[in-house]
Amino acid sequence: MRTITRFLRRFLILLIVFVMGVAGTAFLMNNETTDDRSDMNNPTLPEVMVDFNGTLANRMYGYRQPMEADFVRDSVTPLDTTKKLTIAVNPYEEKIKSLSYEVRTSDGTKIVENRKVKSLDSSGSDGYLRAQIEISSGLLMNQEYSLQISLDTSDGEAYYYTRVVSRSSTNTEDYVKFASSFAQMCMDKNAADGLAAYLESAESSSTNFTAVTIQSPLSTISWGNLSPQISKKGIPVIKEINETTASISLKYEIKAANENGGAEYYNVTDFYRLRYTDTRIMLLDFQRSADQVFDPQQTVITDDGLLLGVRDKNVTMLSNEDGSVTAFTQEGALWTYAPDTGKFVDVFDFRRKSNGDFRDSRIEHDIKLLGINDSGDLDFMVYGYMNRGTYEGYCGVGIYHYDHDQNVVEERVFIPTSESFEFLKSDLGTLSYVNKDNQLFLLLAGKLYQINIDESTYDVLADNIDGNQFAVSATNAHAAWRISDGDQAGQVKFIDFDTLETRNDTPDAGQSLRVLGFMNEDVIYGIVLDGDSLTDENGHTTDGITSIRIEGFDGTVKKEYHQDGYYITDVTVGSTLMQFNLSEKTGSSYTVKNKDNIMNNQAAAAKVVSAEQSSTTRQGVIVKLAFDNKPETDEPLILTAKMKNTGEKTVQLDVDKSQISNIYYVYAKGGLDSTWTDPAQAILHADSLTGVVLNRAQQYVWERGNMKTQLTLNTEDVPEIIRSGSWDKDVLQQGLGDSGTVIDLTGCSLENVLYEISAQRAVIAKTGADSSVVIVGYDQYNTWLLDPATGEVSPYGMNDSTALFQAAGNVFISYLDNQK
């Protein structure tokens, strides 16, 4: 009996152990399968650079999908007469099977050449792989082409982009070395003394490391009292280069010790505009911005608020109603801060906490805060290049939700695009709004998209929208646009993105409407009577507005402005003020007689937190967040949010930009500055920034500082229709046909348009009410003018030419050869 009892006892014990083991295993397995929170994946893509005789330049980051060639212009790589390039690849942990390249026309429509390189040289001491490519196809001089480099890696294809251009005597290697050397010399006060000859320094009473220029004191350019060292060495990126000048951008990281010995990190961007001479390189322009990486482990909580450090004063931030949680962005990262508890959360950040490199720390993205609730839950949008994570190597728009209680970020939807960050940023600058039903609204390429986040679907609410006749409210919750086609053409449509309600305003007979903007959530539009849109003799149209209305979404007219005897022209709408001219009709144009404005009388909402600047001895000008009340604690609690794995939720939009043709891009100071529909205004703007202008096909329209000292065209090479001297643009375009595109340069100076002659393009210039000449040459003292009536070419003094063309209104017309 005792034996049976002992057996039963042992059996029960083993059974209990077995059941508990099974239950424990099931529990662990269940935890493993249901805990879908994790850290963001590390970057995997290799980097690609161009090796100029041992000097590296033009670092390229990989894309996981082919991009539209005409919407990626991160760097320009000059080709010499051999048309050979050495490509350097930093593989990191990836295995590279082969390299291939493809050369396309700058608009991306035609493949010029493509080849594959099977073997890469790994003998270099730096651990990089190298391949030499030789472009055998004939490339036009001074014309950009797109170069796509493809790597076949262990994780699939990766794509890299630069622009190549054949230029003579560009001195590329010297320019690149100068930029690297300049940045390094700034780290040593003694070495920095040798830079004084390159600068135009002036006295200054303050030090601001976010806005350093060639006029800044040498002490500021050499980092004042900060005493930093370079912690991540940059690789120069060529932004523009020609026979006379080059523009170089250099991004690097510096490290400095604070008052307590703690480490501070700063992202630095230097911009150099250089000219090569027989004796030395001249520094034509220099700009630097340094921005501190936020680190709450350092002393950042003070009685005066939260110290953000060295950065731009325009802080993207959002607080909930009682101010218990504030979200803010800094250097590509999103943080929340609770002043009552001292709690910081690193909500979203590509930058790794340790063992990072430029792949995770580069900032080719931006963050827009969409909403925050009383609990601290946060909705936000990340758009641009994704450094790491699920969508590493993609450019696009991601919508995210941060759950404060669970400390987890959930990706709601991702919208990939095939254009680089600077183009995407320009597109999203018009509209991006998410309503409470999780619907995202974007305006891209003339289409108004509604993306249904929960279903990963989208609808097109309207298309063929003229961006010049589209406006959004201060919150982006309302929009208005003039309908351009169909039965409702000419009507103005209003939409409330929260309710999706719409309504239309129809102009009365003999009137047309112009969308001017918004004041708060109220639309502003102008009424133009028939016959008051005047086209002058130079082909420029100006709307003479009779009345301006400010109207609520329900149709209530909040204000109407009208001045008897005057027309309203040149309207600009700001956040607090609308300004305009009061003009009189004079023949086929308007003459400004007075100015007026309308103030925004709505009181600004009280802010629970504001950004303020102060000055320090060591860091110079710094920025802090000031709160209504002193923070309760100066002891920080720092958390890092986890990413929730929800699977891939992507929406692919049918964005087609091929129909957009009359767009001109101004590049300056190392990036895309702005877009224009008027080439003359684009040139004037680029001139003020010492930049360049490219058209939709990425052809050079105008370059500052790249003009031959003298040149005369062979008149037989000038198209016959241009030699006619007509300033009727329609007639000129018809005469050029598919071979070229007319560009109206009216308003530019003679000095501006002589660039076109240097680029082998004649310019029609108006000289009187019914007369014109064709500029076909110039030298230091004269222009060379072709008489359309006789075909004779004769010199005319430069000063006399300037006066002649100015008296006629500076009416200039030229053309661009279409790519073949």
Predicted regions, residues:
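A short hydrophobic beta-strand element
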Residues: 145, 240-255, 376-382, 523-528, ...
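Short coil/turn segments at the loop-to-beta-strand junctions that recur within blades
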Residues: 350-355, 415-421, 457, 463-469, ...
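Core segments of small alpha/beta cavity-forming domains
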Residues: 43-102, 107-112, 144-226, 300-343, ...
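Surface-exposed, charged secondary-structure patches
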Residues: 19-33, 70-86, 97-119, 124-126, ...
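Short loop/turn segments that connect beta-strands within beta-propeller blades
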Residues: 339-342, 403-405, 452-456, 496-500, ...
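Conserved active-site-adjacent core of cysteine acyl-enzyme catalytic domains
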Residues: 710-820
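N-terminal Sec-pathway targeting helices
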Residues: 1-19
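Ser/Thr/Pro/Gly-rich low-complexity linker/stalk segments immediately outside membranes or between
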Residues: 29-49
